[in-house]
């Protein structure tokens, strides 16, 4: 049985439920879910409200992150929260008898059944004695060398940590929490990509390479081109800045995957969120006057949802 792991805060509750719905609807067998959350109470209530939409979940457990007074790098004036570092602490929360975990960011949507390949990767990780499996994001060259030089990496590969298959027994045996926190402090001023930098510094190329079909990145400049998405792609990753739950992101064709699964559990046609009222209003006006509004389903409901979001936001 596959054990999925998520780490988040209240800002990503709906994104989590959307990711979870996409996994549920593309799975043929039951799976378990483990969630490390800063304040899980509201999410637990919401999940109970919609639990009949998640019939393939065998067990779901929520854990409240309890570590206090930790200074996590590169969070000031940033859209990333400390929740991105919660996975360093999995050995404090996840049951000790679990063999393998599949960690997913909450900006990921499942569009085809990943069970077969995930089970195969889990077996290989144990057989080949890797601690994690991940998809390479950067190979060292003239364009990417800054990342490798900044972190003083010896290897030629840097992985994206949005999808990780974890050999949990080996992770525990290596006492990785303490190692990662120590390493985080040592390279504190060099960190640009948060926990991903720390994980790459620790493993330094020593990971099992997994297919990009399990972490199919849709960075901003390519999001409107869906040609690369086919039946082989299982997990798409909205890794760019124009997330599919922003007004700007909805104008991109690839947002349809996220909004489809949001609708399937909530019965609401769009999920829109924003932290900046003025910027969101500008994006909405531009969306209307460039006629993109009429390229989406339920355009008038979209406008109403956007206006409600903008005018109930304090910023």
What are these regions (language model features)?
Residues 22-30:
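Short, acidic, metal-binding catalytic loop of nucleotide-sugar glycosyltransferases
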Residues 39-46:
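Short, charged/polar "capping" segments at the starts of alpha-helices
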Residues 1-21:
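N-proximal low-complexity "stem/linker" segments adjacent to membrane-targeting elements
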Residues 53-93:
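Active-site-proximal specificity loops/subdomain of glycosyltransferases
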Residues 68, 83-142, 158, 165:
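GT-A fold catalytic core of metal-dependent nucleotide-sugar glycosyltransferases
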Residues 2, 8, 166-315:
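A glycosyltransferase accessory/donor-loop signature
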Residues 32-38, 134:
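Short internal beta-strands
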Residues 127-152, 242-245, 250, 254-260:
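A short, conserved beta-to-alpha structural element at the edge of catalytic cores
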